[in-house]
């Protein structure tokens, strides 16, 4: 596993996590 694919996967994880936080915030848990 090289640096580029590792960076893309971590970026995707952070994006998904922040997106889920925004959805949770709008729903008010």
UniProtKB/Swiss-Prot annotation:
Q: Which SUPFAM superfamilies match?
A: PetN subunit of the cytochrome b6f complex
Q: Where in the cell is it found?
A: Plastid, Chloroplast thylakoid membrane
Query: Is the Cell cycle keyword given for this protein?
Result: no
- For whether the record's keyword set contains Transport, the answer is yes
- Which GO BP annotation is one of this protein's? photosynthesis
Under the cellular component aspect of Gene Ontology, which terms does the record hold?
chloroplast thylakoid membrane; cytochrome b6f complex
Q: What is its main location?
A: plastid
Entry keyword set: Chloroplast, Electron transport, Membrane, Photosynthesis, Plastid, Thylakoid, Transmembrane, Transmembrane helix, Transport
Q: Where is the signal peptide?
A: none
**Membrane topology, record value:** Single-pass membrane protein
Matching entries from InterPro entries are given as: Cytochr_b6-f_cplx_su8_sf, Cytochrome_b6-f_cplx_su8
Identify one Pfam family in the record.
PetN
Q: Please list the GO terms describing molecular function.
A: electron transporter, transferring electrons within cytochrome b6/f complex of photosystem II activity
Q: Which residues cross the membrane?
A: 3-23
Q: Give a short account of what the protein does.
A: Component of the cytochrome b6-f complex, which mediates electron transfer between photosystem II (PSII) and photosystem I (PSI), cyclic electron flow around PSI, and state transitions.
Q: How does it assemble?
A: The 4 large subunits of the cytochrome b6-f complex are cytochrome b6, subunit IV (17 kDa polypeptide, PetD), cytochrome f and the Rieske protein, while the 4 small subunits are PetG, PetL, PetM and PetN. The complex functions as a dimer.
Family membership: Belongs to the PetN family.
Q: Which NCBIfam families match?
A: PRK14747.1
What is the designated name of this protein? Cytochrome b6-f complex subunit 8
Q: What is the lineage of its organism?
A: Eukaryota, Cryptophyceae, Pyrenomonadales, Pyrenomonadaceae, Rhodomonas
């Amino acid at each position: 596993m090289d640096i580029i694919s590792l960076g893309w996967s971590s970026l995707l994880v952070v994006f998904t996590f922040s997106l889920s936080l925004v959805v949770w915030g709008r729903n008010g848990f």
